[in-house]
């Protein structure tokens, strides 16, 4: 065991900031415009209070949960984010091995800096694939077929990006993204000129389809047998519409606060979505997870599992595969302690009564 290992995600973030070029760090840690939602994604968790129960035999803690019939060691999933080679030469292959060693599901981003096939062959594990629907539907269909043939078990369709949000740090830094081998031969985009902004902006303008609508869910279902989650749901209205569309699950997400500033923090939107879905499909949540207690709070508010991207990226940047693995292990360890101290022997015993939200406190004063 190395001396002076980081003991929390914040310390890994500090190491990552030192290790990464400014452009790469700002990309993974930045948000849209004023970054209000970026700050709120984390701050909103701090305003939820835990309500521990005592005198419970917690000598055995079971953090395992299931999703789509697959058993996970804990309800922590590695969320999709592109460009892991910004953090480490082995990119997503190193992240995939770290997740597999923790029996955690990894979601591979469409903009992975490693090919789908290379990540799939890097280790045996349950993996999901994140997708956009492009103007050229054949590109999306090809990526779906490749993921399916490589054994990916589900699709996460990102639905909050008809166009790219204004990520001012990326514009200022003239962000250049690692080439994604997944798109070789599928599209040719002249995105090298960053004179008037980031490479990501040019790519998004050329490829993302602003006409994407609910009818495209039917199209996607028609070309794959993989279950489909919609990623980017923050309202009850869209949650109910998603259930009506026949998707396998919804993910409460604001795209890491990179799209619409002043959108709700995801943990603040979670309970609204959970109530709207009413148990019809599992609800996941991402954004702002920095502690095991954050995971506990999300589960108490109805999430089946949480997704964390930035913490794992920080670990990868700081210490490679070992760092990414350690971050997942730390979050698992913190969750185990939180469960024990709140009197919960399994994730099924984590209930709404274990937390008090801002809304609860206000209602108690009325």
Swiss-Prot record:
GO terms for molecular function: (S)-2-hydroxy-acid oxidase activity; FMN binding. Pathway: Lipid metabolism; fatty acid metabolism. One of its GO terms (cellular component) is peroxisome. It is an enzyme of class 1 (oxidoreductase). The lineage of its organism: Eukaryota, Viridiplantae, Streptophyta, Embryophyta, Tracheophyta. It holds the Pfam family FMN_dh. Residues 1-360 form the FMN hydroxy acid dehydrogenase domain. GO terms for biological process: fatty acid metabolic process; photorespiration; regulation of photosynthesis; response to other organism; symbiont entry into host cell. Keywords: Fatty acid metabolism, Flavoprotein, FMN, Lipid metabolism, Oxidoreductase, Peroxisome. It catalyses: a (2S)-2-hydroxycarboxylate + O2 = a 2-oxocarboxylate + H2O2. Its EC number is 1.1.3.15. Belongs to the FMN-dependent alpha-hydroxy acid dehydrogenase family. It comes from Oryza sativa subsp. indica. FMN binds at residues 80-82, 109, 130-132, 158, 231, 253, 286-290, 309-310. A motif (Microbody targeting signal) lies at residues 364-366. This is Peroxisomal (S)-2-hydroxy-acid oxidase GLO4. It is found in: Peroxisome. A 2-oxocarboxylate binds at residues 27, 132, 167, 258. The active site is at 255 (proton acceptor). Homotetramer. Oxidase that catalyzes the oxidation of a broad range of 2-hydroxyacids to the corresponding 2-oxoacids, with a reduction of O2 to H2O2. May be involved in a general medium- and long-chain fatty acid catabolic pathway such as alpha-oxidation.
């Amino acid at each position: 065991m190395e001396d002076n290992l980081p003991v929390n995600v914040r310390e890994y973030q500090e190491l990552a900031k030192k290790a990464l070029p400014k452009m790469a760090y700002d990309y993974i840690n930045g948000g849209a415009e004023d970054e209000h939602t970026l700050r709120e994604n984390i701050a909103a968790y701090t305003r939820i209070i835990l309500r521990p129960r005592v005198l419970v035999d917690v000598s055995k803690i079971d953090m395992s949960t299931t999703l789509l019939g697959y058993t996970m060691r804990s309800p922590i999933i590695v969320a999709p984010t592109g460009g892991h080679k910004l953090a480490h030469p082995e990119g997503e292959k190193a992240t995939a091995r770290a997740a597999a060693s923790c029996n955690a599901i990894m979601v591979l981003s469409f903009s992975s800096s490693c090919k789908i096939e290379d990540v799939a062959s890097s280790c045996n594990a349950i993996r999901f694939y994140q997708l956009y629907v492009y103007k050229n539907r054949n590109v999306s269909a090809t990526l779906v077929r490749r993921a399916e043939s490589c054994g990916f078990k589900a699709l996460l369709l990102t639905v909050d990006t008809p166009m790219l949000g204004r990520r001012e740090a990326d514009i200022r830094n003239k962000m250049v993204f690692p080439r994604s081998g997944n798109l070789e031969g599928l599209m040719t985009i002249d995105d090298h000129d960053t004179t008037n902004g980031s490479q990501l902006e040019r790519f998004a303008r050329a490829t993302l389809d602003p006409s994407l609508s609910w009818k495209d869910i039917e199209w996607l279902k028609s070309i794959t047998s993989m279950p489909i989650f919609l990623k980017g749901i923050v309202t009850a209205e869209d949650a109910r519409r998603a259930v009506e569309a026949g998707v396998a699950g919804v993910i409460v997400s604001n795209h890491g606060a990179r799209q619409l500033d002043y959108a709700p923090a995801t943990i603040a939107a979670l309970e609204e979505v959970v109530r709207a879905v009413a148990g019809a499909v599992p609800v996941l949540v991402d954004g702002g997870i920095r502690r095991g207690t954050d995971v506990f709070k999300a589960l108490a508010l109805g999430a089946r599992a949480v997704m964390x991207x930035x913490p794992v990226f920080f670990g990868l940047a700081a210490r490679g595969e070992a760092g990414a693995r350690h971050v997942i292990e730390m979050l698992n360890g913190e969750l185990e302690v939180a469960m024990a101290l709140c009197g919960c022997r399994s994730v099924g015993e984590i209930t709404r009564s274990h937390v008090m939200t801002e809304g609860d406190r206000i209602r108690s004063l009325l």
